[in-house]
């Protein structure tokens, strides 16, 4: 009789949570330096944050949210809010790119940091739990493997 092999590897939610931790550390570092930053540095931080947030949002949108076919109304509402926040982050970043004074850029970056924190908190407190209720561990591991391949990392 063939032995049943248990699937290994991190699930998508665990990988996204790890990314949350890294992004939050980056935000804390930016926040500490925020008062002393000039316009060029503020825009540079915005550009770096844009790359990280865009990559993160793509994985959430294409792997996590897209895997939730026929979601119940409560989950649909949460997903719409998440998509809306992704759009708001993009708008803030666009405004930051065109800011001409450091005070305005600082205010935009500060608001972006707050929005990212709020967004992650809702995902962690509500959305990820709803996803776990509706998605098997095997499916989450498969999505985790797809995420890892797309990012060029090994999950085990």
Residue ranges with predicted function:
Residues 1-156:
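Small-residue-biased structural context
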């Amino acid at each position: 009789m063939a032995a049943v092999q248990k699937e290994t590897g991190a699930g998508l939610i665990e990988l996204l949570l790890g990314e949350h931790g890294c992004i939050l550390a980056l935000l804390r570092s930016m926040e500490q330096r925020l008062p002393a930053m000039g316009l060029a540095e503020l825009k540079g931080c915005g550009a770096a944050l844009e790359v990280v947030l865009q990559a993160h949002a793509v994985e959430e949108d294409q792997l996590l949210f897209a895997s939730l076919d026929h979601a119940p109304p409560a989950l649909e509402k949460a997903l719409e809010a998440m998509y809306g926040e992704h759009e708001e982050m993009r708008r803030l970043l666009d405004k930051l790119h065109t800011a001409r004074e450091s005070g305005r850029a600082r205010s935009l970056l500060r608001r972006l940091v707050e929005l990212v924190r709020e967004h992650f908190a809702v995902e962690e407190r509500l959305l990820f739990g709803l996803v776990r209720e509706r998605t098997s561990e095997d499916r989450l591991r498969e999505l985790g493997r797809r995420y890892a391949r797309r990012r060029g990392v090994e999950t085990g």
